[in-house]
Amino acid sequence: MNLKNRLILEDYRKQRDDFIRLGDVVHNMLTDIVDSMGITVLGIEHRVKTEKSLAGKLERNGDWYSSFEDLTDILGARVICFFSDEIDKIGKKVEEAFVIDWENSSDKRALIKADTFGYLSLHYICSLPFGDRWPDEICGKKFEIQIRTTLQHTWAAINHDLGYKSEFGVLVVWHENFRELPDFWKLPMMSSSGCAMI
């Protein structure tokens, strides 16, 4: 590992506790957002990237990052909802509650390739605003929020286990067969009002 990546890991070790604190704040804020909207979700989760995971990322893609501050996914949070129209509703509240880095945020739901279905989430790169509400140590640090449906979440997990952990990958025909299952498609294609999303 080169000197630059070693320095990034050193900064990670120094700031890891701040990201752990930030994760708790973000989790609580997302919980409050969902509760205030009266939306029932499958879950809200967050994680701080481990040093081992970060080291592996730097080994694979280290040239993309010139400093620790270039990394936007040290902390990742996710809201898993039941209906597709709830993604945008929750997203609007996220945009109001956090500082959004629009340049690096993305809406991946326009993708329709079989091997990308599990990643069709709404992805925000966020930070907390500076002020009196939170300690300066956790404000301004970038983190990722994903909002996705239960099916997208399940498919991403399946794709990760069968795709990334298999040297042969996942057969495209398996992807296509999964996409054609009516019972799986029914839930995310329905709105929270019970009407089909066209």
Residue spans for each PLM region:
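Short helix/loop capping segments that flank catalytic or ligand/cofactor-binding pockets
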Residues: 89-90, 133-136, 153-156
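An acidic, glycine-/histidine-flanked metal-binding catalytic module
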Residues: 1-18, 22, 139-198
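Short Gly/Thr-rich strand-loop-strand
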Residues: 101-128, 132-135
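Long, hydrophobic, amphipathic alpha-helical segments used as structural scaffolds
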Residues: 30-41, 102, 132, 192, ...
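Short amphipathic alpha-helices in soluble, non-transmembrane regions
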Residues: 90-97
